[in-house]
Amino acid sequence: PKPNEPIDRSICGTMGHVLAVSAATIDPKRVGGNLESAHAILAGLDPAHEIGFAMAMGKLMTVHLNDQNGIKYDQDKAFGVENLRSAFNQVKVLKENGYGENGEYVGLDVKAMRTTRDEDSYKHLENSLNIFKALEEKADRFDYEFQKKCVKNRDFEGLEMYVMNLLMGLA
């Protein structure tokens, strides 16, 4: 789904639209979606929520991870460089739901910045992969027992700070 490019209208601008239209087809089990992080951001949605929604419906066929600074044009920035917490949430929801265990793969839909020298023209891919791997390690270390305790005690500020400390290497 892509909400506003190349024009400002789209029949299936979000994962929800894709799934609704696919349900009306003669063979909905053959239809799924490709979630791109930046496209969800362009639609004003949280990419991790879109991923989780599609996975819960059994309809996430692939993901294209990247990043975006606001609702401008599709920037295809390196994954995690603008919205690190959002990037972490995307990696975490993919891991929690076993994405990749059945042959699915993660794509990196990123592009080099306009004035990048030829010899540096692949750094955006390297940076995206390094950030993904680092966030995967953080997701592996996530303390679900602490999360349960915080939710039980309604200590959402404590949980929020735990996640931030985890991302900053303080937890």
Task: Please provide the spans of the model-predicted regions.
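Histidine-acidic metal/acid-base catalytic patches
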Residues: 10-171
